[in-house]
Amino acid sequence: MSQIVDFVEDKDSRNDASIQIIDGPSNVEIIALSESMDQDECKRAHVSSAEMIPSSPQRKSVSNDVENVDLNKSIELSAPFFQDISISKLDDFSTTVNSIIDSSLRNENNAKGNAKKLLDDLISDEWSADLESSGKKHNKSQYNLRDIAEKWGVQSLKNPEPIAVDCEYKTQGIGKTNSDISDSPKSQIGAADILFDFPLSPVKHENPTEEKHNSIANENSSPDNSLKPAGKQNHGEDGTSMAKRVYNKGEDEQEHLPKGKKRTIALSRTLINSTKLPDTVELNLSKFLDSSDSITTDVLSTPAKGSNIVRTGSQPIFSNANCFQEAKRSKTLTAEDPKCTKNTAREVSQLENYIAYGQYYTREDSKNKIRHLLKENKNAFKRVNQIYRDNIKARSQMIIEFSPSLLQLFKKGDSDLQQQLAPAVVQSSYNDSMPLLRFLRKCDSIYDFSNDFYYPCDPKIVEENVLILYYDAQEFFEQYTSQKKELYRKIRFFSKNGKHVILILSDINKLKRAIFQLENEKYKARVEQRLSGTEEALRPRSKKSSQVGKLGIKKFDLEQRLRFIDREWHVKIHTVNSHMEFINSLPNLVSLIGKQRMDPAIRYMKYAHLNVKSAQDSTETLKKTFHQIGRMPEMKANNVVSLYPSFQSLLEDIEKGRLQSDNEGKYLMTEAVEKRLYKLFTCTDPNDTIE
């Protein structure tokens, strides 16, 4: 029962007052004529015979031949949602094919007296209530067909096919349409399935009957339809006949119901159809994970399930019949992979930059090695794991390597470099291209990064990650001005290889004074020139002053460039005023580098910010507590500890509400310290502060 609805839009009125409905075998299409006759011609067109085609600006004779139909200056628009147009007066389908309707869209009184309309059959139950309510609310509104077409994104067809108007269509159109629709798969779906009724894809013109509403298909596919060929009535009866009969029975029962109840029934059908069990797929998450991720593959893999288990959409993916299973550690977690430990522990991965000569051992290898050392060489194992705090012992393992030119420069001074750095060894390097200081270590143990143990080994000399570049400040900025790229490349060579570069600039204050003096001389010369009008001859400068003038750096620019180099060149700049100042500070630097390998603050970097030092006994711990809480002096803390040697003894008197006095009969502590101690011992809130 597909038909072509031909809408003729008047140019003057711009409304939907004149509408012509013509049955045809194609999809529902809208033909909006760019020009139309005026209202007088429209009235004469309604009185004309049923064989007349839609009116045009020029009145022509009409015949039944398809070629004589004038469709010039018309735009053919495909509108699959033509039911949204509220048309209140339509002609009966059984009277004639080309009958013309002369009624207004806003006339509801005449619509009540008409017989059953064509669009009433086309519109389904769920849409009829919307049309009725929308017609009451917007009875005075007018619809523009072009706006409706643009609203639904309908595109115009360049070559519209002519409308075939002949007598054979009257007898064959209905039977042909019914047979096509009954064979379509749309007749097997409920009327309230909107996704099938109005697909998101564009309308296909090859098979137009599949785009019709489901109500048309269900009405025309009934077994009582006499216009349907006999050969196609039994087609598909094995799979869908029962569903068709149930649906047609429900349609017959709903004919006498009002439209509001019809919509309620249609919505209930939609709810029933939507509550069907969805198609579920059992996911195996191990196929979605990377094979290299050995930690999560065994843990997150979906367990195998029986084929009789049906999961609905409300059940979780990881649901299992046995919810209370015994917690088991994954095999990959017990394997103790060194690389896995390196990646998961952040502080362990950073130890390589500070602790030289180390290796990653598994837990089993570590246990076997410790068991063997405790049997064979127990004293050596204890010795290499002992933490030393003496600076002399820390320097005993160090070797300081100077470049030849730098070592010769430091030996010119009055101090003995070897004596100041003893017991460290001072030696000269073979490369004199850069003023470089390297720190070497004599290692007799190897460090276990994974288990935090030192194992005795054969002596070996390794290089520390810290090195020093020593430059005179003026020479450095001369290279920075003339050979900046080469200087940057040399410094970045070390920092890219994981070295911590310390850039020492000597005589930086002397350079600042030379730059300031040069700027002051230039300023005085400009002032005297403006006052006297004659240029005064500059005083002869020394060779070093002339070299400073060639730098072209101001005092303010010098500070800015130092900050830029420190930030962008990945170095740490340290300035000294003379060579002797650096030589005197070098022993302390060597001691710090010597302690670095066994420093607990570096090995336990995660807790280094706490800055907590352990005490020898409980009495010393209580004494440090007094100092941290009330800044109590050491002598006064000793008096308190002599009477209360432990926390328990002090807590007993605090609970009693009285404290002992000292030997002179005075208070042991001030009132503020007593309040803080009382709060420390009795407070139950861990987030509370001691004021």
Swiss-Prot record:
Tree of life domain: Eukaryota
The keyword Protease is assigned to this record: no
Organism annotation: Saccharomyces cerevisiae (strain ATCC 204508 / S288c)
Region (Disordered): 201-240
Interaction with MUS81: annotated span: 598-691
Entry-annotated residues carrying N-acetylserine: S2
Annotated gene: MMS4
Molecular function in Gene Ontology: DNA binding; endonuclease activity; metal ion binding
Similarity comment: family membership: Belongs to the EME1/MMS4 family.
UniProt protein name: Crossover junction endonuclease MMS4
A biological-process GO annotation: replication fork processing
pH-linked activity: Optimum pH is 8.0 for cleavage of a 3'-flap structure.
Cofactor(s) this protein cannot do without: Mg(2+); Mn(2+)
Residues with PTM Phosphoserine: S48, S49, S61
Sequence ranges of Polar residues compositional bias: 215-225
